[in-house]
């Protein structure tokens, strides 16, 4: 026998059992009467049961006595004087004894509500309170079944009462839908109404509501969980609804008991089935009766084996719910008018008549279910809204703190700014004071000096006159008197006036300044509007002032713009006037030349007028803007004068003429001039018509090319040639063929008839001069520009003859079309190439390789524009000559459009690279080696304290999923980002205690469990702490033997490796904090800066030694990688999946990466020329080949796309 330790609650004496209830010896409901539902039904005590089981079975109409729930240890008030046993007590031999203050009542009572009968389990109870053994199965099988049942509807935690933390007994539902035991709720009510009673009094008696109903003074009961109030009626806790779902599930958990007796008869035979309508277990006889008797015709009988088999499919045990008014009637109907379930008797009494509309419960369920489902859907939507709102509020709280920090910093910055302004004003005032003081001091000192001089002269004159008066005779006195008098009178007239009225005061208005400072220092902008009239008025005044200032600024900008337009218009007018004057001067000069060199024959003059002049003018038309594409000539449309002013009016040199025929020559020259003007107008009209026709055809050709031809079918020079000359207008560089208008077909050389080159417009002149500039360079540099690297070695200096008579030097031939490459004829240095004619705009637009090569070389030399074509990463030693001429990278929009004209470097193999750059990229000539440029894939971070900002971060690492984990040193935190820079989460609180962060310098991740290893200062010089993958503190590791952690890594075994930069030493530490081993490496390096681990080898960067030292895990030195020319001040190292060693440095404010093999052979170099960096810390390579580094002084993280193939 097992004695229960929990106290047993005694039951009150109840009224006799109502009719219709079967005579049962003992009725036990499962799980401590969880299956029983009492609805205020009175039960009474009957005759006492005998001491033996046989005598107790003979008593009819008796109910069970008091009992105890073996799981919860508490009695149930719904079974009279005996609490029913729970599911765990069924099938085990249990002794029901009294351990409390009240003994078990002998008389047996019967549940007055059929719902309380539960499964109808019959148990014999003797006079000693012992129960008959029902089954030999233990608790384990029942618990397993109960777990399977709980997975259907509720969790295990929902079976426990949140007040007593035990299994629910007679669960009651509050209005907030929280479920508690009936006794626990009654205890809460009793505690409120009977403050004098002991809190343990609830455990010594059962509260069924009969004794305390008159003493209920609490109108509401407050939920112990959510504090929501639930109104209580006159019946108190008994009026609260029961949790039928939990009751049914707990009923289902009792099916494991093999010995379940029949509850429908007195035979006490083993039950084989259960009737859902009678809510009784049936023996074999009762089961047959249900099959053949008409009174059980519609009853649903289920065998116990089927119940246990279908336990996972659906909750199939539902006991009938009886009417609270008519205890023998089931609730079968639903009154829509009253919205309550009813029974047959209710329909005949309280719900009769046409005013009440009712249906069966099955029919009414559909309508009510739809309404509840809609309500539940709306409830879930509201829950989602609350969830989102909660997330938003959390973000708003974080954002509010961030804004607080930002505004605080802004206030500090504003104060510092205004302070600097005041200090600047103070300095200006002091300087002004010094100047005023100096000026007045000089004036006073000058006046003093003048007074002293005048005083000396006066004294001298007075002494001289006094001596004459005293010692001179008459004649001497008379002779000296005029001189003395004149001098004295002169000195007295020249005596300066002493008007000293200099005041130096300072006028200040502190009251006005204070008011102005308070108004202009700054205002807070929040969502709250102050409704006070005074503040509203001040705010409106400030807004009006700001609007007035904005309007004044706009007016000033408009006025300035108008003035600029007027000035520009005036300048254009002046330029037009100058052009007209220049044209007139040229015409006069031509006329004088023609008069001096007139021909003797009129035929010769006429012939010259019909050929040479037209030739010269049409030659000018070739290089005028009207021969350009429409995108280059838009500024010339509709302006005939400007177009004509750009024409060259110079003819071919005429033949010399005799001076004898001067009069006839003048007449002929005037006629020639008139004819020339007429011909100019005709040619201009013809050219304009040809231009319109040409533009229309260009548009048609572009549409056809897009629809029918791929873009790569033709080279860029040929496409430009087609766009510029669709009708053969520009056939070759420097040649024009005009076939338009009524005039004759004229073929004109762009250079004229052996004369000088024609005059161009300003745009043509600038571009042609740029294209011709590199041909005047020194021979050495020009030869170097003409050399490119190839796959097999340096490309020889080649001059290729291309159509049009132009030449291409060096590697430009490699980027030209295949047809041009086949026409290479000679080998000579580039300096030996002498252009036979100047480069014109037509040469550039027609694809002349000499012009394009010169422009490309100029772009490479002057701008270092990373274009394709010349500076290739070859093995030529001559190209290193250009390293002294390279400038920082820049962009040239005008030259950038010429990139596609010259062939790319994809045709040239860069076999000396282990990590090959993508086609289309060029090599950057650095001071160390030729490196492949790295493009910035992502850059994130800035100086600040907000989320995603940094303050001098000292270290980072890659996480398990290649997250970027940054040690934000001066912000005392760790931030975790994805590879695109999005902040995932952060952790860390500033402080020196354990679990806090104080200037974290290095961070690493254990890939086997995702834990973070963080090195910071703490109370000591160095400290190491372990955090979980969610950022929760786990333990501290004391590393007093390390001064400054320069590098941090984790081995494959999970050991932490730290290197000390003060005394170069490598320490291997276990996760528990034990020092596994260490070795001194000061003999092989000067200052460590980072460490990487591959297999059993340790790669340690030597910052001051400009190399990487490689050690075995036992400290044995192996070799060094790198040198000062390649790896200058290395500060980051990582090893790719292929085993290549990547060493990074930021020397020269450019992040540079050198790629070595594990044996130490240099394979390739990369460099990022797009951003200047300072003090980069660390280098990591992702699985895609992206290189990640941390710029400490720039306060950001760089993710670079190296196109690394391994």
From Swiss-Prot:
It comes from the Eukaryota. The keyword Secreted does not apply. The keyword Cytoplasm applies. A zinc finger (RING-type) spans 161-227. Changing residue 1192 to A: Destabilizes the NHL domain. Highly expressed in neurons but weakly expressed in neuroblasts (at protein level). Expressed in ovarian germline stem cells (at protein level). Expressed at low level in spermatogonia; expression is regulated by tut. Disruption phenotype: Viable but males and females are sterile. Males and females show defects in gametogenesis and in chromosome segregation during meiosis. Ovarian cysts contain overproliferating and enlarged cells with enlarged nucleoli. Cystocytes fail to differentiate into oocytes or nurse cells and maintain a fusome or spectrosome structure for longer. Ovarian cysts can become tumorous. Loss of germline stem cells (GSC). Pfam families: NHL, zf-B_box. Changing residue 1175 to A: Reduces binding to poly-uridine RNA or the RNA recognition sequence 5'-UUUUACA-3'. Abolishes RNA binding and translational regulation of target mRNAs. It is found in: Cytoplasm; Cytoplasm, Cytoplasmic ribonucleoprotein granule. Residues 934-1206 are annotated as: Essential for interaction with AGO1. Keywords: Coiled coil, Cytoplasm, Metal-binding, Repeat, Zinc, Zinc-finger. GO terms for molecular function: ubiquitin protein ligase activity; ubiquitin-protein transferase activity; zinc ion binding. One of its GO terms (cellular component) is nucleoplasm. Changing residue 1172 to A: Reduces binding to poly-uridine RNA or the RNA recognition sequence 5'-UUUUACA-3'. Abolishes RNA binding and translational regulation of target mRNAs. InterPro entries: 6-blade_b-propeller_TolB-like, Bbox_C, NHL_repeat, TRIM45/56/19-like, Znf_B-box, Znf_RING, Znf_RING/FYVE/PHD, Znf_RING_CS. Induction: Post-transcriptionally repressed by bam-bgcn in a 3'UTR-dependent manner possibly targeted by let-7 miRNA. Post-transcriptionally repressed by tut; tut targets a specific long spliceform. The dcr-1 dependent microRNA machinery is involved in post-transcriptionally repression; target of bantam and probably other microRNAs. One of its GO terms (biological process) is regulation of macromolecule metabolic process. A zinc finger (B box-type) spans 257-304, 318-357. Changing residue 1001 to A: Destabilizes the NHL domain. Zn(2+) 1 binds at residues 262, 265, 286, 290. Signal peptide: none annotated. Zn(2+) 2 binds at residues 323, 326, 346, 351. RNA binding protein and post-transcriptional regulator of mRNA translation; can act as a repressor or activator of gene expression. Binds and represses translation of several mRNAs in a miRNA and 3'-UTR-dependent manner, possibly in association with components of the RNA-induced silencing complex (RISC). Represses expression of brat in a RISC-independent manner, possibly in coordination with nanos, to derepress the BMP signaling pathway. Binds nanos mRNA and involved in bam-bgcn mediated repression of nanos mRNA translation. Regulator of stem cell proliferation. The C-terminal region containing the NHL repeats is required for interaction with AGO1 and for regulating ovarian germline stem cell proliferation. The C-terminal NHL repeats are also required for regulation of brat expression. The C-terminal NHL domain binds single stranded RNA in a sequence-specific manner; preferentially binds uridine-rich RNA with at least 4 U residues followed by an ACA anchor sequence (5'-UUUUACA-3'). The NHL domain is essential, but not sufficient, for post-transcriptional regulation of mRNA translation. The N-terminal RING-type Zinc finger domain is not required for post-transcriptional regulation of mRNA translation. This is Protein meiotic P26. It comes from Drosophila melanogaster.
